[in-house]
């Protein structure tokens, strides 16, 4: 809801796609800078307390931003500060929540658990954009802020009340900060499945997902629609992603994790390419539905592959590395913003999608065994087990 509402609001406020992209940059850059550290903290502290505290702070940030809008005091720099603070909190949510899921269900149930987590997250991307569009068309952006504040306050209370027991650490002296980070990075480098997964993750976040920042601009400038129909565009993507996440939760098997991840990534990039060249709203809508469906293959399998390839003791650290790779997205937001100013928002997304396709195909061509691999916890350091070896 916040992403859509702020994208539309900032574009109406400034008339510049570049500032819309800057909002996306500031929201994501804390994930790049802080996630490895937060992953280490998640391995050393009570994850339930960390998650509940994160949501409480997010609720407070949203209340302050909503009050600034209601009183008419809000300026662009307030929005930038608020988005940055939100980004810091979101960089905590990802490694902590996913590590907790892995702790709770174990390797055997991880596909179903992450699939359901993604399904609920993606369903919020159906309700959120529709709510954001409706609020902006009627009550204003403050309604989106106050609604978010209420939801995060509820989430915080639920997190603190979880019957979650933190994993018991093995006795012995703790290593230093940098030694702990290095341990997580060594595990990443030694496992080729994780390496390829992270390379594609960077590509998707730099060249794929920044298109979302341009949807309000493309909707207004190219498709000639208002906030409500712009919200429907993003809700359609969320609907596709929710449907695919549920299917993955019920049907995915370890032998297919890497194929779902790779082909989902490629199909998503093709779909946003089709969206970027769509001449009408009603052609753009199905393109985003397909894009959302495909994106779920990438988003769900991304965490599943990492969690099932990583020992529980260092899972937070490795998920922190994954979150940092996701945090490269701000650079994509800047690139797409600059290209949108120079060309147009649609042309910028077209160029980004084509580049993303090339850079996703490249590692798959270099390591074709990735598509034949099966992810099994506790495998050798290479992480590659081809179907013929099982």
State where each predicted segment sits.
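Substrate-agnostic recognition of the 12-TM MFS/MFS-like secondary transporter fold
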Residues: 1-3, 26-40, 46-61, 78-137, ...
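Small-residue hotspots at the loop-to-helix junctions and early N-terminal turns
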Residues: 2-5, 9, 14-24, 115, ...
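Transmembrane alpha-helix termini and helix-breaking/packing motifs in multi-pass membrane transporters
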Residues: 7-13, 66-71, 127-147, 221-222, ...
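Helix-breaking motifs and short loop linkers at transmembrane-helix boundaries and internal kinks
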Residues: 14, 46, 68-69, 73, ...
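C-terminal transmembrane bundle of multi-pass solute transporters/carriers
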Residues: 21-23, 33-37, 44, 50, ...
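Hydrophobic alpha-helical transmembrane segments
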Residues: 76-87, 109-168, 211, 233-235, ...
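Helix-loop junctions on the cytosolic side of multi-pass membrane transporters
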Residues: 99, 103, 145, 151-175, ...
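Membrane-interface helix starts
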Residues: 188-199
């Amino acid at each position: 809801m916040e992403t859509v509402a702020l994208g539309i609001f900032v574009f109406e406020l400034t008339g510049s796609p570049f500032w819309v992209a800057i909002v996306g940059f500031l929201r994501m850059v804390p994930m790049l800078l802080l996630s490895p550290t937060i992953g280490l903290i998640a391995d050393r502290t009570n994850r339930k307390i960390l998650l509940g505290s994160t949501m409480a702070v997010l609720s407070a940030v949203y209340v302050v931003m909503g009050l600034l809008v209601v009183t008419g005091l809000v300026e662009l720099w307030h929005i930038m500060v608020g988005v940055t603070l939100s980004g810091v909190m979101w960089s905590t949510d990802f490694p902590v929540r996913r590590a907790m899921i892995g702790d709770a269900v174990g390797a055997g149930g991880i596909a179903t658990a992450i699939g359901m987590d993604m399904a609920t997250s993606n369903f919020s991307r159906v309700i959120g954009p529709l709510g954001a569009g409706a609020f902006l068309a009627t009550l204003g952006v403050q309604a989106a802020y106050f609604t978010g504040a209420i939801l995060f306050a509820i989430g915080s209370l639920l997190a603190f009340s979880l019957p979650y027991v933190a994993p018991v650490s093995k006795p012995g002296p703790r290593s230093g900060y940098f030694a702990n980070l290095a341990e997580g990075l060594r595990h990443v480098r030694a496992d080729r499945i994780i390496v390829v997964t992270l390379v594609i993750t960077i590509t998707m976040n730099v060249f794929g997902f920044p298109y979302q920042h341009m949807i309000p601009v493309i909707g207004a400038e190219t498709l000639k629609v208002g906030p409500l129909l712009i919200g429907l565009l993003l809700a359609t993507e969320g609907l596709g992603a929710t449907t695919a996440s549920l299917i993955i939760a019920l049907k995915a098997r370890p032998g297919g994790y890497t194929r779902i991840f790779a082909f989902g990534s490629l199909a998503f990039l093709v779909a946003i390419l089709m969206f970027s060249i769509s001449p009408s709203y009603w052609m753009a809508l199905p393109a985003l539905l397909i894009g959302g469906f495909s994106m779920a293959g990438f988003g769900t399998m991304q965490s599943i592959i990492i969690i099932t390839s990583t020992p529980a003791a260092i899972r937070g650290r490795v998920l922190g590395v994954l979150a940092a790779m996701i945090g490269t997205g701000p650079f994509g937001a800047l690139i797409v913003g600059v290209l949108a100013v120079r060309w147009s928002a649609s042309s910028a997304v077209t160029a980004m999608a084509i580049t993303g396709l090339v850079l996703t195909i490249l590692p798959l061509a270099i390591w074709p065994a990735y598509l034949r691999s099966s992810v099994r916890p506790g495998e050798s350091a290479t992480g590659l087990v081809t179907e013929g070896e099982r």
